[in-house]
């Protein structure tokens, strides 16, 4: 689908369709008022007859409106004008895309980007419109034999901006929006792929393909079990012992700043391509969704794709920590004591708390890059789902400025996170009689104690942890990966690169 921006009057648009908003109760938006004036009150007369109230999601498609060059006008309800916030704006865009697609409009000029959204500028409105449009049109049908396609799918969308001054920021918004949307799609595709296809080797192949596509400044190295053993990554290796699929760690290095002083930002993604729970096996109900336990790695892959596509002037390293947690004769057990790459020992009390055992060794491994900051992304704890539900990602950090940056990026992008504490009191729950620490700390504050566990391996750099257990996928009828927190991390890196979306 093609996107562009222009600045022009609605009555002069030669297009298959013009999209304008109507507020509740039956109040025309400024652009709709212009069209109504040109058409001698044609639109307001329809509203007076009760054809459209302006409630969110309502639509009315008009054909051959007098004195308007466009073939059709799509009126879309935007709710009450004062209540139009970012969430409602995205819903309106989503409804617009679905309606245009369902009614066979192959192209349209959208004036919704001229609506006032509280606290948001032109760049944000255009970028979010692009991201929302791509999200709305997403489907995962690679493995279906019968693929359904719209009769005449929407191919071109033009976003109108108030004046020519906004064209540059609008074009930049489209560029950024498309790159972020492509990263989200890549993350969703990886997450939705079944575990018999998407194993650690598959993750590694995707990482290698990324380097092939952006060979100018992307290098991928894949570290297998033998090399991990030589590095002393015994905790990581233990988790994958029960699986016939080899554990593989894929390291994607993007260099956008050649300066010797430019330290990288490192992103670490948990890549459990299937988590049965191991010997501490999970209940069978819902276990199919444990293919989503690699959504952290999928998100990191999507972000690296976005960074490479935009050629950001920063250095970023993405690590996909791929493995599979299965029961078996070689599987690790409750009661085992593991020696991590850092030299610290861990008593395993539950083999289903495996993500932290993989991540702790990767967090030690990345010390060699002397990072500016390290952010790990993981579907780590069910406790985070209980704490924050399915709408907000959990955030923990050992560095306040980094945490504040991530919270700001989450607000800018609409991919929200909430900070949880990392207090010494919680560390006490990880005490073990037989090792330096246990891998679980009991039910109270489970998301926090998981973060506390990881914090013991991050003392040499600024670090943040994103627990996406509640936000990485949806269940039920809408089952599928969400691609979060690609948008959050993309905004964080855009801000670091100097593109903060301010006009």
From Swiss-Prot:
Mn(2+) 2 binds at residues 270, 275, 293, 354. The keyword Hydrolase applies. GO terms for cellular component: cytoplasm. Keywords: Aminopeptidase, Cytoplasm, Hydrolase, Manganese, Metal-binding, Protease. SUPFAM superfamilies: Macro domain-like, Zn-dependent exopeptidases. This is Probable cytosol aminopeptidase. It is an enzyme of class 3 (hydrolase). Mn(2+) 1 binds at residues 275, 352, 354. HAMAP family: Cytosol_peptidase_M17. It catalyses: Release of an N-terminal amino acid, Xaa-|-Yaa-, in which Xaa is preferably Leu, but may be other amino acids including Pro although not Arg or Lys, and Yaa may be Pro. Amino acid amides and methyl esters are also readily hydrolyzed, but rates on arylamides are exceedingly low; Release of an N-terminal amino acid, preferentially leucine, but not glutamic or aspartic acids. It comes from Shigella boydii serotype 4 (strain Sb227). The gene is pepA.
